[in-house]
């Protein structure tokens, strides 16, 4: 597949349906929708576009398991839901992931693809597998067993992260030039990241100045989230081998650009406004959250010195 990138909206940082529509071509087969940072995307609008163009919606809820969207869990709204289980997610098994679907034909294809096109767990209805290219995407039994036990803890882990995020929100609420996480109506946020936007004009100094000051105070915060279209693989258009595949494939006659500027909202937020506190790599105590709030207030009390 050849990815075509749509821009994001700046409230929940998820894909912007308007940008998705602008980027659909005759070659488009699916829309991959990450539910980013812990908040579901604008899924009804995206599903409407998918229905109009007969596309599959693959909802990546790796950062948002158990988040709610209009009464449904993230990952169960699109045609397929996927979530990874590596070490910095809400729960983890070391490696591996999960696919969700209520479509039996899609489920069967995924079950075959995971193991070289073979039905190894249970008999499948597919009579002729000659058109099936399979891979080794098997999740080991040990990892699966760990995952089952981790799932039992998920509700309490997420509840604790929401409590800590609420405490952060309350503590940072009155600091000028900051926009704290937005939670849309009929949605819940499970805070894989506590995302913050800096308004440099209101604050009077740059995002990077306050970021560096916060890091100096020991705050576990980042100021970058990869803009994928600017990564070397897309800039050089070389993914497999050294000859430019898949972009040089004779099957693909379209044109795709990955120039800086095609996703202006994502680029501006990454370059000038975004900061984020990871909430899943470490289980914060209330005392540690208080320390983060104290560090923010200390930096803000000294903004004039930092300018």
Kindly give the residue locations of the regions a language model identified.
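PLP-dependent aminotransferase-like
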Residues: 1-61, 68
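Structural detector of well-ordered beta-strand residues that form the stable sheet scaffold
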Residues: 4, 57-58, 82, 179-181, ...
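Generic structural signal for small/hydrophobic residues in well-ordered secondary structure
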Residues: 20, 31, 35, 60, ...
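Basic phosphate/pyrophosphate-binding loop/patch that engages nucleotide-derived ligands
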Residues: 24, 47-56, 93, 98-116, ...
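Active-site region of PLP-dependent enzymes
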Residues: 64-70, 74-193
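A common structural junction motif
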Residues: 117-118, 215-221, 296-304
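Conserved PLP-binding catalytic core of the aspartate aminotransferase-like
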Residues: 181-260
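PLP-dependent enzyme catalytic core of the Aspartate aminotransferase-like
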Residues: 203, 236-307
């Amino acid at each position: 597949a050849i990815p075509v990138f749509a821009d994001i909206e700046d409230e929940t940082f998820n894909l912007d349906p308007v940008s998705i529509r602008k980027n659909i071509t005759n070659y488009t087969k699916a829309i991959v929708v990450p539910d980013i940072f812990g908040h579901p995307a604008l899924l009804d609008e995206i599903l409407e576009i998918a229905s109009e163009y007969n596309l599959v919606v693959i909802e990546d809820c790796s950062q948002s398991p158990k988040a709610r969207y209009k009464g449904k869990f993230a990952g169960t709204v699109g045609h397929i839901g996927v979530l990874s289980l590596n070490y910095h997610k809400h729960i983890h098994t070391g490696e591996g992931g999960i696919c969700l679907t209520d479509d039996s034909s899609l489920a069967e294809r995924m079950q075959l693809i995971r193991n070289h096109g073979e039905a190894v767990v249970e008999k499948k209805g597919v009579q002729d597998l000659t058109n099936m290219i399979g891979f080794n995407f098997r999740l080991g039994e040990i990892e699966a067993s760990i995952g089952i036990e981790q799932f039992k803890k998920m509700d309490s882990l997420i509840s604790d992260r929401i409590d800590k995020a609420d405490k952060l929100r309350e503590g940072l609420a009155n600091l000028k030039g900051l926009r704290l996480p937005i939670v849309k109506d009929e949605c819940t946020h499970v805070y894989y990241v506590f995302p913050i936007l800096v308004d440099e004009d209101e604050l009077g100094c740059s995002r990077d100045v306050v970021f560096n000051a916060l890091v100096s105070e020991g705050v576990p915060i980042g100021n970058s989230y990869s803009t994928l279209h600017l990564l070397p693989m897309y800039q050089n258009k070389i993914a497999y081998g050294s000859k430019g595949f898949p972009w040089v494939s004779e099957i693909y006659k379209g044109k795709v650009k990955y120039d800086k500027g095609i996703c202006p909202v994502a680029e501006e937020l990454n370059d000038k406004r975004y900061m984020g506190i990871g909430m899943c790599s470490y289980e914060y105590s209330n005392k540690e959250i208080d320390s983060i709030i104290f560090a923010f207030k200390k930096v803000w009390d000294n903004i004039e010195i930092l300018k």
